[in-house]
Amino acid sequence: MARVRGPRLPGCLALAALFSLVHSQHVFLAHQQASSLLQRARRANKGFLEEVRKGNLERECLEEPCSREEAFEALESLSATDAFWAKYTACESARNPREKLNECLEGNCAEGVGMNYRGNVSVTRSGIECQLWRSRYPHKPEINSTTHPGADLRENFCRNPDGSITGPWCYTTSPTLRREECSVPVCGQDRVTVEVIPRSGGSTTSQSPLLETCVPDRGREYRGRLAVTTSGSRCLAWSSEQAKALSKDQDFNPAVPLAENFCRNPDGDEEGAWCYVADQPGDFEYCDLNYCEEPVDGDLGDRLGEDPDPDAAIEGRTSEDHFQPFFNEKTFGAGEADCGLRPLFEKKQVQDQTEKELFESYIEGRIVEGQDAEVGLSPWQVMLFRKSPQELLCGASLISDRWVLTAAHCLLYPPWDKNFTVDDLLVRIGKHSRTRYERKVEKISMLDKIYIHPRYNWKENLDRDIALLKLKRPIELSDYIHPVCLPDKQTAAKLLHAGFKGRVTGWGNRRETWTTSVAEVQPSVLQVVNLPLVERPVCKASTRIRITDNMFCAGYKPGEGKRGDACEGDSGGPFVMKSPYNNRWYQMGIVSWGEGCDRDGKYGFYTHVFRLKKWIQKVIDRLGS
């Protein structure tokens, strides 16, 4: 059949050509007539069939106006079309002349309200550093790359995705100011969108310089005459009957002179000097002294980032290390003597699936990703639960049958409208499943009191991000409910070395997400990940936020080839390490904050529990009965 049709084609074409020649004078207009009827600006093709070429954006949209569909035909990419169309529509008033359109599309200046702006200004008009668009700290942004895919919400550059009449803006890194406009150049004019108005005090995230004089050793040797606390309360005289009663049975250093009512640090509190005060819930408050910067890893003989002392190196062996209870059982409750020894593991001399990795890290082991936890792996894990709407709020940890430890920002953080009371919350203990009620295993308890550290700094950097929760009544311990130990100075000195690994557990999201439905990233059961401690200089260099002695960071460095991190929902949960000397688990940190989840060059930051242990003891001693 093909052989029959082939030879006929030339004949057909010849007949058609002849027909056109005979009748053309009746069908076609002369060139001059046609030009007079069709007055249309003509575009010269630069090549064969130029209009159907991929990526011909120049012809379709720049030489004359185009539709979104035409832009998509040229770009053949939805994301690229979104990005181009956002700028193109923002530049509608600058279509002519062509040079003005080019300047607008380049985006280094603001046209109109500045929705076209794509420059690199990342500081607000008052000098505050902009928050990363992908970050939820310090503010939870309702505008992000998912809600506004064409707005070029990269890094922390000023943008105007919502068409604000004041021009490009950003969320700020100051928890006290949610968003502020930026000062960017206006296209074709010698002015900026808004004038610069410097704030008194400058950026909230800058590293504050040390004063020339500072108080060393956390005020242990302080002999000054300050007698007023951070809240302005006047100190009680140490010789007063009330102060004597409160000092009874306290482990004070007899070498510290308790003169008059001056601030002192007789118990070696890592928070510094303090005094008793009248009519306060805890009967004591800290004093506002300028302490010298002395990282805890330094005064513990543990300089994160340096090799541990070879004489103290752990070669996979364990030795008996006598455990000394720290708290008064009358106020603390039961469980400390047996803390950190899991009923389904240490008490049965059974290892869990990944604890070997922790021991290997003490002699240079590997990092693994997060995975489902074994049942009973973290019997101190607590779920902080909101009553209405019913939802997982945060993680927490059981430290006795009466007390729970969590992060302060889980309870009080005004930028996220958090200010919870005991009536808003309950705790669920002994859980493994995230959503299912585990009958005969989990216990649900109401709260009696919430105690947030008095110097918790939500306004700047979440310093002292710690809170104590007192249960309504003691919880019954079991194979699935068991307290974790809090570290003493010796344990912290032995375990807090860069590269040594700890463990984070929680029901938080398995990856960062902006979608309204997060079911696909929520785990069904408790997750566990082992993470290495990171050198303090690396922690500080990874963020613009001011890092204090009350924090440490952990996670992976770029290029190490492994991933994992705490994420949203894990906050308040424990960072624990297992001592190879006595086989007990110690809570070294509390999941506090991070910039995104599992991002290269970014680390998770944790509240340093040992640094704040004296505060924990004082609250429990005063208020635990």
UniProtKB/Swiss-Prot annotation:
The active site is at H409, D465, S571. Expressed by the liver and secreted in plasma. Glycans are attached at N120, N144, N419. Residues 25-43 form a propeptide. Residues 1-24 form the signal peptide. Residues 44-90 form the Gla domain. The modification 4-carboxyglutamate is found at E50, E51, E58, E60, E63, E64, E69, E70, E73, E76. InterPro entries: GLA-like_dom_SF (IPR035972), GLA_domain (IPR000294), Kringle (IPR000001), Kringle-like (IPR013806), Kringle_CS (IPR018056), Kringle_sf (IPR038178), Peptidase_S1_PA (IPR009003), Peptidase_S1_PA_chymotrypsin (IPR043504). It catalyses: Selective cleavage of Arg-|-Gly bonds in fibrinogen to form fibrin and release fibrinopeptides A and B. SMART domains: GLA (SM00069), KR (SM00130), Tryp_SPc (SM00020). One of its GO terms (biological process) is platelet activation. The gamma-carboxyglutamyl residues, which bind calcium ions, result from the carboxylation of glutamyl residues by a microsomal enzyme, the vitamin K-dependent carboxylase. The modified residues are necessary for the calcium-dependent interaction with a negatively charged phospholipid surface, which is essential for the conversion of prothrombin to thrombin. Residues 554-576 are annotated as: High affinity receptor-binding region which is also known as the TP508 peptide. The record marks R199, S200, R317, T318, R366, I367 as: Cleavage. Its EC number is 3.4.21.5. Activity is promoted in the presence of negatively charged surfaces, such as polyphosphate and dextran sulfate. Inhibited by SERPINA5. Heterodimer (named alpha-thrombin) of a light and a heavy chain; disulfide-linked. Forms a heterodimer with SERPINA5. In plasma, interacts (via N-terminus) with alpha-1-microglobulin; this interaction does not prevent the activation of prothrombin to thrombin. Thrombin can itself cleave the N-terminal fragment (fragment 1) of the prothrombin, prior to its activation by factor Xa. Belongs to the peptidase S1 family. This is Prothrombin. The gene is F2.
